[in-house]
Amino acid sequence: MSNSTDPSDYCTFEICPITEAYVYYVPSLAGNAFYLALFAVLLAAQLVLAVRYRTWGYLAGLSGGLILEIIGYIGRIQLHSNPFRFGPYLEYLICLTIGPAILSASIYICLGRIVIVYGEGISRLRPKTYTMVFVACDLVSLVLQAAGGAITSVADADQYDLAQDGINIMIAGLASQVASLALFMALCLDYAWRVYKSPHNLSPETRMRDLRHSLRWKAFLAGLALATVAIFMRSVFRVAELKGGFHSSLANDQVLFMTLEGAMIAIAVIALTVLHPGLCFDGLWDQTKWSFRRSRDSEMQLIEVSAGHEAKAQRADLGMS
């Protein structure tokens, strides 16, 4: 609803029932303050780690998403004192809806680098293709969710069809995010299977091989998987929540929201911070960066390394004969 019908113009707890508020409950001050503080700390940690390890692309998605999470929980804290206010409700609704789509971009850029660590030859797609395709999907999801939120926000109370159109567009955006995350997980599993089946076709570069065998690397992969699954679960929940509309019982269940929205995103960002690629790539984050110009160079370097190994093996065979 637009602010022309804002219940805060005439409603207080003493005058209006909670069913006239934008959410049918009083948001928990302690719970929302906890998430606000947690995401603020994680944002600061991400900034420090980015400066230390120069992981600017990784920072972009996480910082953008975390800023939106912080704004969203500020809105929910404001709703604690007055759930009839439209402004804080809009802050919470839009920011917490689109924030995870931006967070997902940081996950997507990691897959291309993981492919370089293991070897491009066994991948179905080039490293840059993974990043470009999924970031593009993320952008589509983001635009749909933002557009749906904007349409819903300007609909007056008597413009049910317009409000429902906005909700449907938001659902489409969230559904596209679920679909892209599902495809991303499927391609990750496919690549993992190819790595498992082709251990002799992995990148022969010594530093890449050592990185693959390190405990920190394995922990990084586990953390990335955990973050992906957590955001996926959250997105499925939000699709189901919006499917019933803003006045459904699911959309007004605070415990479910704090668990399947707040906790899932918290788990994801904690994993993406504690197991930061700057800490787990052993100084190879920049070396695994692709670009249109360097993609071919990387392939030639791997070919040269492989040729060097073959030449050494041939010399060894000649020496033995």
Curated annotation (Swiss-Prot):
Q: What is its subcellular localisation?
A: Cell membrane
Q: Which residue spans traverse the membrane? A: 31-51, 55-75, 92-112, 131-151, 169-189, 217-237, 255-275
InterPro entries (UniProt xref): RTA1
Q: Which UniProt keywords apply?
A: Cell membrane, Glycoprotein, Membrane, Transmembrane, Transmembrane helix, Transport
What top-level branch of life does the organism fall under? Eukaryota
A Gene Ontology cellular-component term: fungal-type vacuole
Membrane topology type = Multi-pass membrane protein
Query: So which residues have sugars stuck on them?
Result: N3
Main localisation: membrane
Pfam families noted in UniProt: RTA1
Describe the function of this protein: Efflux pump that is probably involved in the efflux of himeic acid A, a ubiquitin-activating enzyme (E1) inhibitor.
Q: Which family does it belong to?
A: Belongs to the lipid-translocating exporter (LTE) (TC 9.A.26.1) family.
- What is the name of this protein? Efflux pump himE
Q: What species is given as this protein's source?
A: Aspergillus japonicus
Gene symbol of the encoding locus = himE
